[in-house]
Amino acid sequence: MLQSLKNVFFSDTTTTTTPTTPTTPTTPTTTPTTTTTPTTTPTTTTTSTTPISNLSIKRDIGNINDYKNANYFNYYRILENKYNYLRYNTGLKNISNNETFKLIDFTIDSEMNNTCITSNWNQKYSNNSSTPVEGVYKIPLAPYSVVSGFTVEYQDKVFIGKIKSKEKAQNQYSDSIASGGQAFLAEKTQDGQFSFRIGNLPPNENVTIHLTIISEVCPHLSSLQNCFHRFLFPNYSFNFQFNLNIKLTLPIKTIELLYYPNKDIKFKENSNNKEATLTFSSNNGIDDDIVCIVEPENDIERPQSIIEHSKLNNTYAVSVNFTPSFSHLTSDDVNQKSEFIFLIDCSGSMSGEPIKKAKRALEIIIRSLNENCKFNIYCFGSRFTKAFDNSKMYNDETLKEISGYVEKIDADLGGTELLPPIRDILSTESDFEYPRQLFILTDGEVSERDSLINYVATESNNTRIFTYGIGNSVDTELVIGLSKACKGYYEMIKDNSNFEEQVMKLVSIAFEPTLSNIKVDWGTELQIEQGPTKIRPLYSGETLIVYALLKDNKIPQSTVQVSLIGDGPTGSKLEFPITLDFSKTIDYENNSVHTLAAFNIIKDLEEVERKGNHSNNRDRIEELGKNYGLISKYTSYIVTAASEQVTEETMKTLNIIQIPTTTTTSHTNFETEEDSDDLFSSENRNQTLANISNDMEKIKDIFDDISRLISEQSCMLNEIGDANIEASTLGINSIPQKSNIFSKITSFFSSPSEVSTSKSNFDSDIGSEERRNNNNNNNNNNININNNNNNNNNNNNNNNNNNNNNNNNNNNNNNNNNSDNSDSLLKLIRLQKANGSWSSPFSEFKIDLSKKPSNIDNDDIWITLIVINKILNDYPTQQSQYDLVIQKASKWVKQQLTRLNIPNQYGSLLATSKLYI
C-alpha cells in the first residue's frame, strides 16, 4: 500500500515578505549580486519541524549563490583547472597575435522554463585576412548542452547547417573544398568542444555565426540556474547583449544576476509571477561568468510537467521535474535501503598512522550501517582484494566476517592502481533498489587520472562517489574530480587528529533521506520513449528531470494521469501523481523539450553500445539526430555551397591551439570502443606554430616552478628527488605540485607518444600487466631506499616505523590519553550487534540487571540504554564519530518500546539508566 504523502513530506518552514524595492541578500564579497523579488501579497507558512537528529553532523550545504559548488559547474571547474588559456582561443581566432578574426558584436537571446534553456547566439566577426581562409570555430560545450542548429552568413549569403551521417558529411566537405566551393563541417570534439571549420572564406569578408544551444536547466538546491562561463567569451572588448525570458509553472520568488549589477529585471503582468524578463548589456566584453539564478516556489508534493507541441511535425514531448523535501523526517523515520562500498588505499605510503586511522574509521563506519544495507570493502595497491565477491546484506554474520577482514588490513599492497578495483565495482550491475554509494580513501596519485575520472562519470547515473584525500601529497584533482564526476562529496584530511571526524562527516551525508528505484508510470493511454531510461536516485537537495517523446501523434482529448513512483526514505513505496493536460500544451519555437528528450534518448542508446551489449542503435540515433538537429556518435552538421568565384589562391588555415584531449564520446566523457573519425586532419597541416606556442608556455611554466622551488627550503629538493616521474595526461597541468617538477620536465622532453593519453592503454586497465609489475617494483625499490636511508641516519631504530615513532615521540606522549580513550570507545562499538543493540552477556563493564524496570522484558534493552549513556557521558568530544552508532542503537530501543506499548518512555528510561553507568 502506498504511504500517504502528507505523512512523509511537509512544507519547509518559511516566512515570505513583500519587499517594496529589490532586496540585496548576504553573499560572499567575491560574488556581488542583487536580488529582485516580485511584489505580491505575501503568504506565511509555519510548520513545526523535527530535525533528523539532535546529534547528527550538520553539513553546510551552502546557498544558491554558491554556484561553483553545484554539480552542473563541474565541467567548467575542470576547464578552469586544466585549460588556463582556453578563454583566449574561443570562437574564430588566429593562433598568432594578429587577430585575423575579431568579435565585434555578440547577442544571446535565451528562454528558460522548468527544465530547458534555449539560447540563440548571434556573433559578428571582422575578417582582416588578405588571403583565402579556412577558419576553425570552437566553444566549450557542457555535457548537458547541445547545439541544435547553426548558420553562417557572409557576402549577404546565409548557409544553414544540416545533420547528415558522419561519413557523408566528411566526404561532402572534402569534395566541396577541393572544388573551390564553401563548406562548413561541425562536430563535437573528443575534449567536449563544439567545433566547425569554415572553408574557403574570401579575403576581408566579415562573418556572422548563429548558433542555437539548448541546455538542461541547471538546478542547484532550491534554484534553477543559467550559466555562461567566461571561457565562452574572448578576453577583449566587444558589444554584448543578453536577453533572458523566464516562463515557469510555479511562481518565482527571486531572480538574481551575479557579478553584473547594471541589469533590468521585470515581472510580466497578470502572470502570477511565473514569467519575467532579464536584460543586460556591455560595451566592454565579459570579464566574469554570467550566472542567472531563479528561485521558484517549491511544490514538494507535486512534480511539475510541461507538454510541448511541435508544429513542425505535429508531435508532442513531455518533461517532468521534481525537487522533494525530506528535511523534516526524523532519524527514526528513515529506514531506507542502500549499498555501501569502501575502497581503501593500502599502498606502502599509507603505512603507520594513516592505515591505523583508516582501519579505526572503518570499524566505526561498519557499525553505523543498518540491516537494510548491502556492504563490501575493497583494499587496493598494485593489486586489490575484497571482503566479499559481491556486496552482502548487513547482519551479525556478515558484520563478524567483515570485521575479521578489517583487522587484517595493512599497507602492504605496493603501488596505487585505482582503476582495476573501480572497474570491478562499476562493472557490476547496480541495483536501483539499493542505491550504490562508493567511498574512496587514498593518499596518493594515479596514472591517467583524467581518463579514470571520465570513466567513473559514465556511471554517475547509478553510483555516487565520496572521496577522502589523506596528507599533503595526495592528488587533489583526483580527490575532487572523482567525487564531482559522480555528484558526491569529498574531504581533504591533512591532520590525522581529526581523521575519524572528517570520515564520518561524509558518511552522515550518505545517510540523508533518499528517493530511489524511481520510475514513471505513463499508464496505458500514452506510448512514449523515455530519456533517461534509468533514473538516478534522488538525494537530498537534488532535482529530478526526465523527458519523453510520444510515439503516436494521437493524443487523448482529456487529461491523462501518470505517476512518479519510488522507494521513499521511510522504506515505503511513494507515488506522486502528475496530471498531463493536453489542452494546455506549449509551442516553444525551438522545440527545446523535444530536443532534450531526443538528446537523452541518444545518450542512453550510445551508452548501451559503449557497454558492449552488441546492440546496433545506429539507425535510431541517426533518425533522432536528423529530426532534431543533434550531433551524435553517427551524425555531423554540414553546409556546402558552390562558390560564385572559385578560390584559386592558397588557402590559409586559421586554427586555435590544439588542446590535448581526454577520451570522450559525443555526449559523455568516455570514448567509445570505436575510434572517432579524424574530422580535423586539416588542422594538423599548420600545427607547427601551435606547437611552438604551447612549448614556450610549458618551458616558461617549468622554469617559473624551478625558480620558485630554489627559493624555498632546501629540504624541498629531497622531495623533488624522490618524486615519481609521471607523464601528464593532458600535457598541461594546472598549478603544478612541487613534487611534479621533474615529471613536467620529463613529459615535455619526451616524445608525444610517451605523454599523450592512450585509449588502448586505458582499455587494458591503464597499461599492461608487465608495466604495472614494473611500477610495483619501482615503488618497492623506493620504499627500500627510504628505509635504508632512515636506518643509516637512525642506527638505534630497527625499521622505518620505529624511526617515525621516535621522531614523533613527544607528540605521541601528548596524545596518549586521547588514544586510550579512543580505544576504549572502539571496544564498546565493536560489541554492538547489527541491529543496533548491545546484548547479554556484557563484560566490558558491570551492568546491574536487577535495576532493570519491570515493564522491560528484554535485558538487551536495558544494556543498550546504559551503553548509550556510557558513550555519551565518557566520550563527549568524539560525538561526531559515534553519532550514527547511537542513532542506530536508540532507534532499536524505540522499536522495542513500541512493541511493549510504551513508545513514549524512551526519554525517561534513558534518564533512569544514566544513574547506573
Swiss-Prot record:
Pfam families: VIT, VWA_3. Residues 339-507 form the VWFA domain. SUPFAM superfamilies: t-snare proteins, vWA-like. Residues 13-51, 751-760, 774-818 have a biased composition (Low complexity). InterPro entries: SNARE (IPR010989), T_SNARE_dom (IPR000727), VIT (IPR013694), VWF_A (IPR002035), vWFA_dom_sf (IPR036465). GO terms for biological process: vesicle-mediated transport. It comes from the Eukaryota. Residues 679-741 form the t-SNARE coiled-coil homology domain. Residues 87-215 form the VIT domain. Keywords: Coiled coil. GO terms for cellular component: membrane. Residues 12-51, 751-822 are annotated as: Disordered. This is von Willebrand factor A domain-containing protein DDB_G0285975. It comes from Dictyostelium discoideum.
